[in-house]
């Protein structure tokens, strides 16, 4: 009998992508995050769908509709907590996935990497519009502050902001369109994920050594499917622990108050996963300069493949580059901490130094380290 999964037009695609896919034999747990991101996306779409059934995108009822979901809908509290904390897990996996790509030189698959950066931007946009929906104080003021950044664009800025708002301030029209975007964008993310996978399967996965592995491949199933299930168990353990024991740990207390345009919170800040970029934005006193630095902090990922100077792909055997990578990691954690602090000394100067170091590491120090390591590895006569 002919094996159906190898002949059926639809099952053949699934078979080539998830069952008989040739995978390097030495990829570590750092390669688990791609599948975990896919699972996070499915969790977010499903919980979001159930929330959308009860949510109302109207300024008068949005806040109370979220309270209604938590109090009156069967397991509404659980669905809402899973959705809110699922976003945090999504970004945690995203940052680890990007970090692994930088450490092991996966960015040299340029098409896969560039689609990945576009995916990151799309997920960030989705999370931003989603944060506005509960219509709490931080939702309203976060939307006001971040959308106002478009006004820094010369000549068309203010017109652009009012066009995005649908009026002269963040109001009912803004909330309605943000809800529409928040519902639509996850499906765009799902589509881009398929493109991301298509490009990845053109080249095959990278591996910790950063060397071609065509001579030593193993089938994805059962080896890596089992490994991915282990990763899934860890993900669900952390997500459920967060959602059931401390669902508000990563949220902002100000968001428990309904949006009030007449009362500004003492310290406006986004969710934790945007704080590093927010700290870079705030570290520049000029508005346009801050917006450009904010954009550059993410878009800099697009030029990383062109800054690769080392003869070796992976950082596994490059101790100087490794040190700089972990300094970059610590620097990003510092920026995240600074983004959550009020705008006063010593936080201002720490934020400015960390922002300078962030760009310096990626644009100058890491390429120089690659060149120096090439020189050190050159056989001496």
From Swiss-Prot:
Matches recorded under Gene3D superfamilies: Cytochrome Bc1 Complex, Chain C
The UniProt annotation places heme b b566 binding at 97, 196
Give TM segment ranges. 33-53, 77-98, 113-133, 178-198, 226-246, 288-308, 320-340, 347-367
Q: Which cofactor does it need?
A: heme b
Q: Which GO terms describe its biological process?
A: mitochondrial electron transport, ubiquinol to cytochrome c
Binding residues for a ubiquinone, per the UniProt record? 201
UniProt subcellular location: Mitochondrion inner membrane
Between which residues do disulfide bridges form?
none
**Binding annotation for heme b b562:** 83, 182
Q: How does it sit in the membrane?
A: Multi-pass membrane protein
What's noted on cofactor binding? Binds 2 heme b groups non-covalently.
According to its UniProt entry, the function of this protein is described as: Component of the ubiquinol-cytochrome c reductase complex (complex III or cytochrome b-c1 complex) that is part of the mitochondrial respiratory chain. The b-c1 complex mediates electron transfer from ubiquinol to cytochrome c. Contributes to the generation of a proton gradient across the mitochondrial membrane that is then used for ATP synthesis.
Note in the entry = Heme 1 (or BL or b562) is low-potential and absorbs at about 562 nm, and heme 2 (or BH or b566) is high-potential and absorbs at about 566 nm.
Cited PANTHER family = CYTOCHROME B
For this entry, the protein name equals Cytochrome b
Lineage, highest ranks first: Eukaryota, Metazoa, Chordata, Craniata, Vertebrata
């Amino acid at each position: 009998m002919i094996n159906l999964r190898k002949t059926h037009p639809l099952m053949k695609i699934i078979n080539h992508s998830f069952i008989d896919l040739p995978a390097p034999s030495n990829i570590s747990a750092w390669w688990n995050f791609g599948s975990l991101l896919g699972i996070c996306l499915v969790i977010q779409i499903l919980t979001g769908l159930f929330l959308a059934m009860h949510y109302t995108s109207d300024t008068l009822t949005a806040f109370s509709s979220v309270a209604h979901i938590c109090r009156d809908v069967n397991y509404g509290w659980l669905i809402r907590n899973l959705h809110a904390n699922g976003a945090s897990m999504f970004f945690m996996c995203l940052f680890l996935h990007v970090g692994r790509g930088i450490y092991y030189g996966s960015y040299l698959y340029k098409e896969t990497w560039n689609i990945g950066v576009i995916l990151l931007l799309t997920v960030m946009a989705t999370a931003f519009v989603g944060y506005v929906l509960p219509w709490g104080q931080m939702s309203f003021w976060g939307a006001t502050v971040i959308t106002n950044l478009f006004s820094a664009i010369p000549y068309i800025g203010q017109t652009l902001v009012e066009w995005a708002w649908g009026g002269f301030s963040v109001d009912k029209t803004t909330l309605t369109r943000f809800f529409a975007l928040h519902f639509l964008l996850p499906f765009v993310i799902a589509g881009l994920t398929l493109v991301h996978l298509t490009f990845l399967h053109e080249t095959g996965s990278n591996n910790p050594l950063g060397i071609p592995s065509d001579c030593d491949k193993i089938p994805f199933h059962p080896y890596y499917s089992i490994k991915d299930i282990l990763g899934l168990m860890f993900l669900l353990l952390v997500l459920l622990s967060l959602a059931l024991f401390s669902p508000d740990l990563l949220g902002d207390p100000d968001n428990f108050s309904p949006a009030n345009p007449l009362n500004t919170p003492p310290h406006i800040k986004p969710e934790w996963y945007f704080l590093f970029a927010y700290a870079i934005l705030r570290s520049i006193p000029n508005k346009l300069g801050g917006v450009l630095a904010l954009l550059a902090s993410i878009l800099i990922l697009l030029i990383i493949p062109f800054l690769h100077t080392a003869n070796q792909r992976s950082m596994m055997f490059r101790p100087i580059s490794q040190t700089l990578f972990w300094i970059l990691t610590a620097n990003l954690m510092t920026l995240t901490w600074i983004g959550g602090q009020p705008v006063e000394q010593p936080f201002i100067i720490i934020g400015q130094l960390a922002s300078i170091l962030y760009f310096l590491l990626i644009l100058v120090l890491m390429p120089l380290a690659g060149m120096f390591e090439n020189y050190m590895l050159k056989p001496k006569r």
